[in-house]
Amino acid sequence: MALAVCACGTAASPPGHGDARTVSRVGSATHDPTTPAERAAAVTARSTFRDDIGNASSAFVADVAHLQGDLQAGDVAAARSDELAAQAQFDQFRQLAGGDPINASTVDELATQVGPGQSFGGLHAVERDLWSVPGGDVGAALSDASGLEAQAPVAEFLLSKDAPAPEAIGVLGVDDLNWLVDQAVTEDQERYSHLDAVDIAATADAADTAVSAIAPLDHLVDPTLAAEVAEGCTALLADVAALGPPTQVTDGQLGAPQLLALSRQADAAAADLARLSADLVPFGTGGDGDP
């Protein structure tokens, strides 16, 4: 599985100081009226992010299909790799998928989140099947992966209907960073494989995807704050890369000082991104519909 770690928010360079404007960063933006260049950049941001999510959801469907095929062949090692790849792809659109809680829980629910009378399924059920016993429980994994294979195209279809506005894209990035700190860094997700570095790396990359999509618009609206967001995100990705290969570094190998530094960097990046997202309110809020 390849987890891309790319330069965050470097899609455009800040314009000259002569183009600077006064922008409110408290609650909502007062940047009005918008310019034709900004409106064009807003349309591009929505289209770019929609394509990014579409690519991730398509890859998720493919990874789940590979998982089913490798389980049918009895190849546990390959199936484990497929499960981690699918988990990383889900992390790319986790926050957007959260708009449909039933679909999201069907795909990525933890055992402790299963309600009375409900059955445990999805990615973490397959993870349990593959890692909780030596050599994996292929029969159980096949059953759980079959349900996941049926649900994956549903998730892809639901996501295809979303085209978040620039402000909403920024908020999704903030949510990614908050989830990274509150859920991934705490090592609460991968309870059987103990490879939470997969979630850490993929979620940081998801935040980067959001920041990169709105970067050209950000640099037109508030170049100074846009540069701060880019710098913070680049520093976060460097911290994540320093942890090592996500699929090879177990939770026991992740040092507390490293995780604390990463959490602080993610918190700082989230704060800056939240401020910048508020400046994008004039370009629309919310999500459904064509860009």
PLM region spans:
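C-terminal motif of bacterial Sec signal peptides marking the signal peptidase cleavage site
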Residues: 4-7
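Mature extracytoplasmic or organellar-lumen-exposed domains after removal of signal/transit peptides
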Residues: 9-291
